[in-house]
A protein has these predicted regions:
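Enzyme catalytic cores with a strong preference for nitrogen-chemistry domains
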Residues: 1-200
Length: 200
């Protein structure tokens, strides 16, 4: 499977600008004919959106951006587009949005995986803004059984997260479901020496 990793820097709160970046990338990757384009965590809204998520208009605007993404995907019907977005709560029981990985192809949302593990330590306060995933699912595409995780979901059993912080392990759940390919989308806040830390 040909996958294009679309590493780019969205601007927090600039939904129109972020969508335009995505549109340009969708167009510019056409000659390579990837079957899947992968964008970062919360790409549509920018990361970290924090208190913007407290505004109903911001969530509504994000869902409208997702509708526009569906239209953009029609220009490349052979390519699936995986993008991070704050997804509006469904029903009345869940008022907080989810931090979601949404897959769109040929005008349709064909898969969605919400983030399972919401960090609330150090600079992170995601439990305040988001509802966690209820489960992890497998996406079958291009002959693969794909597990999609979002940032913290992949770190549950690593030395980077305090032991016992989370009750479930999405990686273990996906392994038990027999995934053949794992995709993790992530974003993290900038700080001084971040690039040096990433390289080392």
């Amino acid at each position: 499977m040909r996958i294009a990793l679309c590493q780019c820097n969205p601007v927090m709160g600039d939904l129109a600008g972020n969508l335009e970046k995505l549109r340009r990338i969708v167009r510019s990757t056409a000659p390579e004919s990837p079957e899947l384009l992968v964008f970062p965590e919360l790409f549509l809204q920018g990361y970290p959106p924090r208190d913007l998520l407290e505004n109903a208009w911001f969530i509504s605007d994000g869902m409208r951006s997702l509708e526009q993404l569906r239209e953009i995907s029609r220009t490349r019907p052979e390519t699936a587009i995986l993008v991070g977005a704050a997804f509006a709560a469904s029903g009345t029981a869940r008022k907080r949005p989810t931090n979601a990985a949404v897959v769109v192809r040929d005008g349709e949302v064909i898969f969605r995986q919400d983030k399972s593990l919401l960090p609330s330590y150090d600079v992170f306060d995601e439990t305040r803004y988001f509802a966690p995933a209820r489960d992890v699912d497998v996406w079958e595409y291009g002959g693969e059984r794909i597990g999609i995780t979002i940032c913290e979901d992949i770190w549950c059993s690593s030395d980077l997260v305090p032991e016992g912080l989370y009750e479930r392990d999405p990686m273990k759940q996906l392994a038990e479901k027999g995934v053949s390919l794992l995709i993790n989308i992530a974003a993290s806040p900038f700080h001084v020496d971040k690039q040096r830390q990433r390289v080392s």
